[in-house]
Swiss-Prot record:
Family: Belongs to the GTP cyclohydrolase IV family.
Keywords: Hydrolase
One function term, GO molecular function aspect: GTP cyclohydrolase I activity
UniProt xrefs under InterPro entries: GTP_cyclohydrolase_FolE2, GTP_cyclohydrolase_FolE2/MptA
Main EC class the enzyme belongs to: hydrolase
Pfam families per record: GCHY-1
Origin species: Pseudomonas aeruginosa (strain ATCC 15692 / DSM 22644 / CIP 104116 / JCM 14847 / LMG 12228 / 1C / PRS 101 / PAO1)
NCBIfam families hit by this protein: PRK13674.1-1
Site positions (May be catalytically important): C149
Protein name: GTP cyclohydrolase FolE2
Function noted in UniProt: Converts GTP to 7,8-dihydroneopterin triphosphate.
Reactions catalysed: GTP + H2O = 7,8-dihydroneopterin 3'-triphosphate + formate + H(+)
Length: 298
């Protein structure tokens, strides 16, 4: 008995006569290796459908090509190779290939003072695109930090001054008494409000960039902000964090400018956009600021 030939409906033509910008799959589970870690990722893979007579693409070919990403350390060269396989397997049908990876690798971060350290998650999206020889890669990275309101800090200082005036008016100042007062809740009657905040970085990588500079970008951004959220801490670390917040008072405008200046000096960035969100503890709404830049633009 002769085996039946399985039908390939995707090879059929259509009378619709309409090319499509993107056709593919979303949310494909995939293990990848980044920074020596095995990380669970989700992939969106697709190509353009430029032949207006073609009914569809061959999605299984895209799915199978993704297996190449499991073989070694994830970098831009292997991402480009996968995109090229997308196009090679759709010769005559597609001119553009797209791949997006969503993952959340862990970085071990040291405490500020003590020898402790702990793991911190960094939500990451990698967007890549290939058309002919034009390969583009963009990193979306989220950083979490603490922001203390400069206005609230000034108001708190004023209240402390007023209480000091009330408690010591007309009295000779004694060093020991003042020192004890400064260390008491009776003296420090107000503290500024602060909140956990987030910076969303979208960075276009330069053509000569090969590796994925996750740790470099995290270090660069957190150093610019000065108040990255911590992992394992002792009391000495918590005190150092309080000092860092006091020395890095920030409105959302201040935070986005710090990040903008830092990324402008990063040679592997060809362009970027930044969005910072301060989840206000004073208000029921967020404070937001944005900035963008492109190398060579006026």
């Amino acid at each position: 008995m002769n085996a039946l030939t399985l039908p390939d409906i995707a090879r059929q033509t259509t009378t619709a006569d309409l090319p499509l910008d993107w056709v593919g799959m979303q949310g494909i589970a995939l293990p990848v290796q980044i920074g020596g870690q095995r990380v669970a990722a989700e992939a969106d893979a697709g190509v353009s459908l430029d032949d207006p007579q073609a009914r569809g693409i061959h999605m299984s070919r895209l799915y199978l090509a993704l297996a190449e990403l499991e073989q070694g350390e994830l970098d831009l060269s292997c991402l480009r190779a996968v995109l090229q396989r997308f196009l090679d397997s759709h010769a005559g049908l597609s001119r553009r290939a797209y791949l997006r990876l969503r993952l959340a690798p862990l970085l071990r971060r040291p405490a500020l003072v003590s020898p402790l350290s702990g793991w911190k998650r960094y939500p990451l999206v990698l967007d890549t695109r290939l058309e002919g020889d034009d390969f583009q890669a963009e990193v979306h990275l989220e950083l979490t930090y603490s922001s203390t309101c400069p206005c609230s800090a000034a108001l708190a200082r004023q209240l402390i001054q007023e209480r000091f005036d009330q408690d010591f008016a007309g009295q000779p100042l004694d060093h020991a008494s003042v020192l004890a007062w400064l260390g008491s809740s009776a003296g420090i009657v107000a503290t500024p409000h602060s909140q956990r905040s987030s910076a969303h970085l979208r960075i276009g990588l330069a053509e000569d960039c090969i590796g994925l500079p996750l740790e470099e970008l995290a270090d660069l951004g957190e150093s610019a902000l000065g108040t990255a959220v911590q992992t394992a801490v002792k009391r000495a670390d918590e005190q150092a964090f309080a000092l860092a917040n006091g020395q890095n008072l920030m409105f959302c405008e201040d935070a986005v400018r710090r990040l903008h200046r830092a990324l402008q000096g990063y040679p592997q960035a060809s362009r970027f956009s930044i969005r910072v969100v301060h989840a206000e503890s004073l208000h029921a709404h967020d404070a937001v600021a944005e900035s963008h830049w492109q190398r060579g633009a006026a």
